Design a protein with these regions (language model features):
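Glycine- and acidic
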Residues: 82-87, 145-154, 176-189, 214-220, ...
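SAM-dependent methyltransferase catalytic-core segment centered on the flexible catalytic loop
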Residues: 228-247, 251, 295-393, 398-405, ...
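Elongated alpha-helical scaffolds
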Residues: 1, 324-326, 445-451
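Charged, often flexible domain-edge or linker segments that flank or initiate folded functional domains
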Residues: 1-137, 186-317, 420-424, 442, ...
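Sequence-level detector for compositionally biased, low-complexity segments
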Residues: 285, 337-339, 364, 383-541
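Short acidic/His/Gly/Ser-rich catalytic and metal-binding motifs that mark active-site loops
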Residues: 175-176, 297, 334-336, 430-432
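Class I S-adenosyl-L-methionine
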Residues: 110-118, 122-208, 515-516, 530, ...
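Generic, well-ordered alpha-helical scaffold segments in large soluble proteins
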Residues: 95, 104, 108, 127, ...
C-alpha cells in the first residue's frame, strides 16, 4: 500500500470552493430561509402589479377597462356577488406571478394553456398591456429558476407535493395574509384524508350496497384546497384502474374559491391521474373555481364572457345527483377587528336554512357562531345530498359540547339515520393540565381549535332519530400518536364506538344535571328577580 496523496489548498481558495458548493446545494435542494426571502419579494411585486393594473384601469373607455369589467362580472357570477374590484385585481396579480411557477413545476404538462380559468385570465392580461407588467419579470426570474431547479429530477409525488405545499404556504402567508385569515387555510393530514375516503366507501357499501368506484356515484369535495381528497382518492386504489378514467371524466367533482389553491388542486389531480393510469395528460373537467356556498343562491343577470367555461362546469355540477360529500371545510369564524374590511360573506338562502333549523332549535341568546363557515358547510352539504347520501368532514370539534350548538346537534339527530363522531381533541384554547390532556393539534400550528371527524348517513327509509356513535381518541396524545391511531383504524368500521343517548337539552357528552333549574332565575319571565336585561358587556352600553 503506497502513501496516500494529499491536496495542497490555499485557505482562501478553499473558502471560495466551500461557498460555491454550498450555493449549489441550496440552489438544488432549496432551504426554508431562501424561500421566505423570495416570498417577501413576491409580496412587494404583487403590490406593484396591483398598482399597475389599477393605473391601467383608470382609462375609462379603453379596451383593457372593458375586458376587466367583463372579467369582474364573471368573477362575481362564479364566486360571489360581493367580490370587489380590488379582489379581482388581486386575483390577476396572483395569476401573473404564479403562471410561470406552474409552468416551471410541471414542464411538459401545458397546464396554464389548457385550464379554463387560466386561459380567461391570460386573455385579460394580454389586453391590459402585458408590457407594463413585465418590468418585474426579471426580478422574479431568479425565483422561477429556483423552482425549476428544485423540481427538476423529483419524480416522487410526495416530494413534489412537499414543494407545492411549501410554496403555497410561503406565498399565501406573506403575500396575501388577509386571504389566509379570512378563509382559515389549513392542510389536511393524509392520514385523516384516507380515513375519511375509506369511511365514505365503507358506509356506502354498508348502507346503500354501492362503492365509490361504481357508476352513478358522484363524489364532491366542495372545499378542495390543494386537491388532497381527490388526489388520494386516485392514489389509494379505492377506484380500480379500469374504472378510474370514467370516474375522473364524469363523476369526480371539486370546488375551490382561492385562485392559487384552485390552480394547484387542478395540477395535483391531473398529475395523479396521469401517473396512476399512464394515460396522456388530460385536463380535469370536474374542478370549478367557485364559492361553494354561493352555488345555490339565486342567480341574476345574463350569461357573460368573464369565465364562460368555468361557469359551464359549475352549471353541470349543479345538475348532478351528488350523494357523497367529503372534505375539510374552511375554519374561519369572523375576524378580530371589524375595521379590517375582511368580514365573512353573507348567503341569504343558506343562512335562511340555518335560521330555520340549527338556530330555531338553539336555546342560546347569541347565535352568531351558527353561521361559522364549518357549520354552514354542514348545512350546505346536508341539503345538497337531498334525501339520501353521505357527508364526511373533518372540522372544528367545538360543536360537540358547545352551548350554542344544541340546535345543531338536535338537527343532526332529526335529519340523519346515523351520526359518527370521532373526537380528535387538541383544544389549545385551554391551559395547564387541561391543555396537556387535550394533546397535540392534528393540524399543527394551522388551528388551535379541537378537531373532529364527522360521518353523517342519510337514508330515505329511516324513521325516527339518528343513532349517535361517539369515540374520544384519548388523553395526553401527541399529534403523531393521534395520526397513527387514525391511520391504524383505516375506516370508521374499525373504531370502537360508544352509543350516546342525548338528554332533553341535546347534550351529547358532559351532560348537565337538571338541578340548576331549581334555582330562582335572575331574569327569566315571569318569575324573575329583575325585570330588564341587556347584553351590556358586548354592546358596551
Amino acid at each position: 500500500g503506497g502513501e496516500q496523496l494529499g491536496f495542497a489548498f490555499d485557505p482562501e481558495e478553499l473558502g471560495k470552493w466551500q461557498d460555491a458548493m454550498f450555493a449549489k446545494i441550496v440552489t438544488k435542494c432549496g432551504n426554508r430561509r431562501y424561500w421566505e426571502d423570495w416570498a417577501k419579494d413576491i409580496a412587494e411585486i404583487a403590490d406593484r402589479h396591483q398598482m399597475r393594473i389599477r393605473a391601467l384601469l383608470e382609462k375609462p373607455y379603453s379596451k383593457g377597462k372593458k375586458a376587466f369589467d367583463e372579467f369582474l362580472k364573471g368573477v362575481r357570477k362564479n364566486l360571489n356577488p360581493s367580490v370587489s374590484q380590488n379582489d379581482a385585481i388581486e386575483m390577476l396579480a396572483q395569476h401573473i406571478i404564479t403562471k410561470p411557477v406552474f409552468d416551471a413545476l410541471f414542464e411538459g404538462y401545458a397546464f396554464t394553456s389548457k385550464n379554463p380559468v387560466s386561459q380567461s385570465m391570460q386573455k385579460i392580461m394580454d389586453i391590459l398591456d402585458a408590457q407594463a407588467l413585465d418590468k418585474e419579470h426579471e426580478t422574479l426570474e431568479g425565483f422561477y429558476a429556483s423552482v425549476r431547479e428544485r423540481a427538476s429530477g423529483i419524480t416522487d409525488p410526495k416530494g413534489r407535493q412537499k414543494i407545492i405545499i411549501e410554496l403555497y404556504d410561503k406565498f399565501f402567508k406573506t403575500a396575501f395574509p388577509r386571504m389566509v385569515e379570512r378563509l382559515g387555510i389549513v392542510y389536511t393530514p393524509v392520514e385523516i384524508v384516507d380515513f375519511i375516503l375509506h369511511s365514505a366507501d365503507a358506509a356506502l357499501q354498508a348502507h346503500f350496497g354501492t362503492r365509490l368506484a361504481d357508476q352513478n356515484v358522484h363524489i364532491l369535495d366542495p372545499f378542495t384546497g390543494t386537491g388532497t381528497f381527490p388526489v388520494r382518492l386516485i392514489e389509494t386504489g379505492l377506484i380500480p384502474p379500469e374504472k378510474l378514467p370514467y370516474k375522473y371524466r364524469h363523476e369526480l367533482h371539486a370546488n375551490e374559491i382561492v385562485l392559487l389553491a384552485y390552480y394547484i388542486a387542478a395540477i395535483n389531480i391531473e398529475e395523479a391521474f396521469h401517473r396512476v393510469t399512464g394515460l396522456e395528460y388530460e385536463p380535469f373537467p370536474g374542478i370549478v373555481l367557485t364559492d361553494t356556498f354561493q352555488m345555490n343562491e339565486p342567480q341574476t343577470g345574463d350569461l357573460y364572457e368573464g369565465l364562460p367555461e368555468n361557469h359551464k362546469r359549475s352549471d353541470e355540477q349543479k345538475a348532478r345527483d351528488i350523494r357523497v360529500i367529503v372534505g375539510n371545510p374552511p375554519y374561519s369564524v369572523g375576524q378580530d377587528n371589524a375595521n379590517d374590511n375582511n368580514q365573512n360573506l353573507k348567503y341569504p338562502r343558506l343562512d335562511g336554512r340555518i335560521a330555520a333549523t340549527y338556530a330555531a332549535h338553539s336555546t342560546a341568546t347569541n347565535k352568531n357562531s351558527l353561521y361559522d363557515s364549518y357549520i354552514r358547510a354542514f348545512r350546505w352539504a346536508s341539503d345538497r345530498i337531498k334525501d339520501e347520501g353521505i357527508v364526511c368532514f373533518v372540522t372544528n370539534g367545538g360543536w360537540i359540547d358547545g352551548n350554542t350548538m344544541d340546535g345543531f346537534r338536535k338537527t343532526l339527530q332529526d335529519e340523519f339515520a346515523d351520526v359518527y363522531v370521532f373526537n380528535l381533541r387538541g383544544n389549545q384554547r385551554t391551559s395547564g393540565e387541561l391543555s396537556r390532556k387535550e394533546g397535540g393539534k392534528v393540524f399543527g400550528s394551522g388551528s388551535r381549535t379541537p378537531v373532529a371527524i364527522t360521518l353523517l348517513i342519510k337514508r330515505k327509509d329511516h324513521q325516527g332519530k339518528a343513532a349517535i356513535h361517539y369515540h374520544d381518541i384519548g388523553d395526553y396524545l401527541s399529534r403523531e400518536q393521534k395520526l397513527e391511531i387514525v391511520s391504524s383504524f383505516g375506516s370508521y368500521q374499525q373504531v370502537p364506538w360508544q352509543t350516546l343517548e342525548p338528554n332533553e337539552y341535546h347534550d351529547w357528552i358532559n351532560q348537565r344535571s337538571g338541578d340548576f333549574n331549581a334555582f330562582v332565575p335572575l331574569n327569566d319571565e315571569p318569575d324573575a328577580i329583575f325585570a330588564f336585561r341587556s347584553r351590556g358587556v358586548e354592546t358596551s352600553r
